[in-house]
Amino acid sequence: MVNPTTQPTSAAPARDGASPRPLRGMAPSPARARSAAERSAEAAQGLSIVVPLHNEAASIARLHARLVEVARTLGANRALACEVVYVDDGSGDDTLAVARALPATTLDVQVVSLSRNFGKEAALLAGLDHARFGAVLFIDGDGQHPTAMIETLVGHWLDGGYDVVFTAKAHRANESLTRRLAVKMFYALVNWGARTKIPEDASDFRLLSPRAADAVRNLPERNRFFKGLSSWIGFRQIRIDYQPEERADGRTTWNLRSLIGLSIDGLTAFSVAPLRIATMLGLLLALTAFIYGGQIVFETLVYGERVPGYPSLFVGVMVLGGVQLIMLGVVGEYIGKILYEIKGRPVYFVAEHALKPREEAKQTESDNRTAAE
């Protein structure tokens, strides 16, 4: 559920060209579908494909070749102009050099190099800010998001009238039990008591219509959680299940530490559940202490028994001290986010930006000029 008036329609993977079907328990979105004329006008604005990169020198050429074919297909079947925006997020390898050399055959190529590693959320925003066309599609640079699905996502946007077409993992059978439990705990916590739910297992591989892209782009906060924000904006949304492909080149730059950091940032940027849990835990401990204190008074007055003091006092102080420090850390995370917002620093800085127009467009322009002469 995105909000009380707009819900995403969830769909199972299409088979043999069939359109996705709504899953049970998910109501279709009541938001008004855009007319054919509106969708045609949006298609004329084109499609920007944003690819955040961090140490992906080994995989970017293969991914670009796939995107070139996708752009050729979309241009032939839907007359859709495309561009790709590569955002180098402070890579330590040759990612930037490889990106600069990529050919612009069937689509324009932008290369945006950030001044340092600002993180994936900043890279996504940088790509969104530099996107020149109307709709924006986000795809990871490691090649694990299936580019063959891009045409399906575009179809739901143009033919189905959806504003947010997001993908989610069909299953996690190939992942460890610990990771699966951690993912479930994260989504349970971030969605607990939230008015806007983030679809479980949703990925950053998604397409935003022009108005959805503008909505996300214009949100003022600097602590951004892309999955949450693209759900929060509402509009008509649909889920498409997919299974990540095996990584063909290089190795992942994500480790346990970075995943935990991303989870904490997403949780504190989009949910107040930890603060509510702290309040409930404080009330529970206070109630427990009150009951235990009442029991001590009762036993002392009625039975005249002396309750052993030191062990129980020591354990109680240690438990309360540990809980207080944990809750202080939770509050500190939110205060840190507030401080970051108040400072008003830019989310990122651009060190280098280059635009390479597609060769097919230049050739067509040259042919037209020659014919006119």
Summary of predicted features, one role per range:
Residues 62-65, 69, 97, 184-187, ...:
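Generic recognition of well-ordered alpha-helical segments
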Residues 2-16, 20-175:
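Structured catalytic core of nucleotide-sugar glycosyltransferases
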Residues 2-16, 20-44, 225-373:
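Hydrophobic helical membrane-anchoring modules
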Residues 55-58, 144, 217, 221, ...:
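Residues in soluble alpha-helical coiled-coils and helical-bundle/repeat scaffolds
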Residues 110-116, 120-130, 144-229, 245-264:
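Acceptor/aglycone-binding surface of glycosyltransferases and processive sugar-polymer synthases
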Residues 69, 73, 101, 105, ...:
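Conserved amphipathic alpha-helical interaction elements at protein-protein interfaces in regulatory
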